[in-house]
Every structure is written in C-alpha cells, then in structure tokens.
C-alpha cells in the first residue's frame, strides 16, 4: 500500500486481520486440508497473551504440511482432545491418521484413548513418542514464531487466535497445500484462490477458459 502512495493506520490493518483472517481460514479450509500423509506429528508451542503463556497446539504431517491448530489457555488432556477432535472433524475415514507422534506429555495419551473410545479415531491408530520424529514440527514452530514475534504479545485469546489463523492459512498456501486448486503458478495463483473464495473476480471456470484462450491465441 505504501508503494502505491496509500497511507493506512496500523489499527485499520489490525481490524482487517481480526475481521478477515478467521473468515479466510474458514473459506479456504477445504482447499488446504487435503492429501495429508497418514503419519501425523503433534506438538504445542507457547504464545504470550496479556503477559501470560498460552498453548498453541499444532499438527503437521511428516512432510511438514499443516494439518490443524488450536489455541488453548491450558495444557491438559481436555485441551489435547479438543484439538485432536478439531483436526479430525470433517475428514473421511481414509483421510484419518494411521500414526500419531507426540512428546511424552500424558495429556495426549489420555486424549487419544478417549477419541478411540468415542469412535472418532480408529482403534488401530498407533501412538508413538519418538522425539526425533517431531523435529519437523519443531522446525515449523520456529518459522511460525518468526511471524508472531513482531506482534509483541496479544491482548486476548480471541484476537491472538484470529491473527494466528491468518498466519497459518497463508503459510499453508505458501507450502503449496492448495496448489491443485491454483490455476496460475506461484503467488498469483494463491491470490486468485483467495479472491475466488470471497467472490472477487472471475469464477474458476471463467478464469480457466480465459487462460486457454490466451494460450491458443499465443500459439496461433
């Protein structure tokens, strides 16, 4: 915006994030939450809210693709179960994990046991606690923290969660998790995917037809 000579107050940008980040995560969720490896890595990292540490539960597959996330004021079996339940919600049977790797926190074991009992997780799902297997998610935490650090603390859990939703969905797009739905390469394809999700610009069909016409015209 600054390069275009447009001055926008930081509070305006903050309000945009709070309004649109959760909506963007909701509208794009179907696109970036597809094609996971059946081996999931679960872990939590710390996020400061009003001067106190909260817990950001996160899951990635063994390739490092983002599966889901959940911000909680507590680190407990209840929070772990809520996070895992959220990650599993909406997945077909064949999309659910065959293996879950966690740290040695007892909360995960309790949550996994309850979800199996409730039929939300296959009873054959293996629970591992192999430290080096979580290197991939610990590295991913670090990349996310680079984005969070300039914020210098959040004022409330809802505002923190809204901002993190924006960070997570944009990182998922940059990882290429929605690439099959991007009709154009690179950032332009990601931008158009977001625009289509909000009903901005041509539809996917119109865009695809336009690209084909351009291709044939260039080849003529």
Listing of model-derived features with the role each one plays in the protein:
Residues 50-66, 76, 84-88:
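Short conserved beta-strand segments at catalytic cores or DNA/RNA-binding microdomains
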Residues 1-40, 44-48, 78, 82-220:
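Charged, often Cys/His-bearing segments associated with DNA-binding zinc-finger transcription factors
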Residues 73:
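Short glycine-enriched, charge-decorated loop/helix-capping segments at active-site entrances
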Residues 66-67, 97:
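Short, solvent-exposed beta-strand edge segments and adjacent coil->beta transition regions
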């Amino acid at each position: 915006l600054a390069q275009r000579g447009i001055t926008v107050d930081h509070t305006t940008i903050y309000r945009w994030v709070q309004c649109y980040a959760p909506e963007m995560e909701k509208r794009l969720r179907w696109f970036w939450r597809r094609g996971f490896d059946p081996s999931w890595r679960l872990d939590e990292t710390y996020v400061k809210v009003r001067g106190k540490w909260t817990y950001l539960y996160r899951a990635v597959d063994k390739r490092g693709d983002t599966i889901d996330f959940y911000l909680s004021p507590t680190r407990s079996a209840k929070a772990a179960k809520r996070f895992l339940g959220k990650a599993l919600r909406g997945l077909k049977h064949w999309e659910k994990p065959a293996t879950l790797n966690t740290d040695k926190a007892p909360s995960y074991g309790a949550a996994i046991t309850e979800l199996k009992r409730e039929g939300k997780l296959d009873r054959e799902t293996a629970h591992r606690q192999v430290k080096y297997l979580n290197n991939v998610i610990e590295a991913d935490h670090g990349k996310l923290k680079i984005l969070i650090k300039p914020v210098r603390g959040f004022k409330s859990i809802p505002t923190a969660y809204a901002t993190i939703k924006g960070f997570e969905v944009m990182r998922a797009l940059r990882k290429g998790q929605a690439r099959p739905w991007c009709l154009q390469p690179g950032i332009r394809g990601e931008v158009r995917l977001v625009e289509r999700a909000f009903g901005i610009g041509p539809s996917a069909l119109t865009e695809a037809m336009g690209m084909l016409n351009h291709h044939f015209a260039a080849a003529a």
